[in-house]
From Swiss-Prot:
It comes from Streptococcus mutans serotype c (strain ATCC 700610 / UA159). This is PTS system sucrose-specific EIIBCA component. The active site is at C25 (phosphocysteine intermediate), H585 (tele-phosphohistidine intermediate). Residues 533-637 form the PTS EIIA type-1 domain. It catalyses: N(pros)-phospho-L-histidyl-[protein](out) + sucrose = sucrose 6(G)-phosphate(in) + L-histidyl-[protein]. Pfam families: PTS_EIIA_1 (PF00358), PTS_EIIB (PF00367), PTS_EIIC (PF02378). Residues 3-86 form the PTS EIIB type-1 domain. Keywords: Cell membrane, Kinase, Membrane, Phosphotransferase system, Sugar transport, Transferase, Transmembrane, Transmembrane helix, Transport.
Amino acid sequence: MDYSKVASEVITAVGKDNLVAAAHCATRLRLVLKDDSKVDQKALDKNADVKGTFKTDGQYQVIIGPGDVNFVYDEIIKQTGLTEVSTDDLKKIAASGKKFNPIMALIKLLSDIFVPIIPALVAGGLLMALNNFLTSEGLFGTKSLVQQFPIIKGSSDMIQLMSAAPFWFLPILVGISAAKRFGANQFLGASIGMIMVAPGAANIIGLAANAPISKAATIGAYTGFWNIFGLHVTQASYTYQVIPVLVAVWLLSILEKFFHKRLPSAVDFTFTPLLSVIITGFLTFIVIGPVMKEVSDWLTNGIVWLYDTTGFLGMGVFGALYSPVVMTGLHQSFPAIETQLISAFQNGTGHGDFIFVTASMANVAQGAATFAIYFLTKDKKMKGLSSSSGVSALLGITEPALFGVNLKYRFPFFCALIGSASAAAIAGLLQVVAVSLGSAGFLGFLSIKASSIPFYVVCELISFAIAFAVTYGYGKTKAVDVFAAEAAVEEAIEEVQEIPEEAASAANKAQVTDEVLAAPLAGEAVELTSVNDPVFSSEAMGKGIAIKPSGNTVYAPVDGTVQIAFDTGHAYGIKSDNGAEILIHIGIDTVSMEGKGFEQKVQADQKIKKGDVLGTFDSDKIAEAGLDNTTMFIVTNTADYASVETLASSGTVAVGDSLLEVKK
């Protein structure tokens, strides 16, 4: 890569006079611009050395890749005369140019709290779907499977119990996550959640030791009253509730910080938890619980009223608006609302989650429009992007399709809205609802009410068919000049570059051989496409896997050479003896910690053996900084291989386990 040339091209594209400040992390340039609209996006999209771009938190980020980004950055500093700044300083510069938006702040808060507990709700919801499958009449004749095969009734009852638990004890889950977000002790947050469900639990235990969870012990159920200093306080149980526990734990965090600052260390350990919990507990049952329960009920009932009143027309409008909402980030607040809808369904007071159904229709429509672009465009880079992001959208992750393809051409985005609106309206007419959270796409049928699954599948197919047909038809008739110009450019490029590209490709592939890459750290393996960073989830840096660490040490996954060892200790670039170029990136946006909590054990150009220690990190410090410690394990020269396969896409992995396999 010609670093000076790439830097010059980036500067030209964003505008030299438009640049305010620049920093870089392990993979990308981070720029603060005066006006994002002045960027020549087409020039950057056409640049083979630029792997992608996106905007977040007031920063315009240009993906270059490990081992190259620091040299490109140096050239940008040299050519512009800007002062070098850290990523943390860049955040402050970006923030200073933005006005505080309370709505966006609330959305981010809700997202931070609810995203970590979604797996528990997904598990509970899917178990509920399984129980519905076993107990619903009409799916397999006039009788349910349990009625036809009584021997499975015990298993069905146990599944029902397990499915109800995450929702019944939802305040405990929310209490833990909210405490972490508000900076309180997570176990105290859990305690507040337990206190809020305790009256209902005590009621059930008192009724019968082996009785199933009854609807009597649902939202607002109570066993009597307390006389608190003359006040008649209801012994209410806040099972299935979200808003009351959020406010209660927020108060807990304020009290805990207050007492930590003012109590002597000799008594702080004992009295801070005691005073924080007892004050929060009393205020929860006397004030917070009753008031916030009413607010929660108004919110849920209002949404249900809107659904009941507008019917399929309202669903159609929502289907058209969902993707534009995703562009603004407002959809991050939906899990909190959906949790309430699902909880209401669980306790028999609601219809179910129609937001999930609408989201699924919208995601599939955007994916279909992206696939239409695959067949319309002659641009090889766009073909690759549209195929990968199209699959991603069909599985529920639409950002790569939206920002990388559909919004670039504009018309696919609007054509997809026609498909999503039509399918959502039909789903509303058929009263298709979800009973759990999950993947809002083709796999979303796992979250749908059992009796509605066939209708859901039909609606998904309708969404795909309409969006694909309208996009392809418009592209062939109205946007033909756009793709003709692309084809001409692509042919000219191929004529100039065909021979050197073939030679380079042959040389690169000759230098790599098949090999298996070992897990560099212990933890839980998760799909790379699910991580909360578009640079990695879009696979712009290459294919790989992510790990939620259970330890604090990073080990060499192969025999090879350290190409990059960042001073911040948060990322390592390695080239194996067999040619695989590997990036290990500890955490998301952890470059902003500037090395705090990280210790680097190797240097650039150092030879390493599989199992050698590369460095250590402190997950607690990463959490204290409000960051995610999910670690990316990526093959950055993916293009040199015929395939990069994950050998363990989920579940627990140990250091040294076979994790990725690369084949020529």
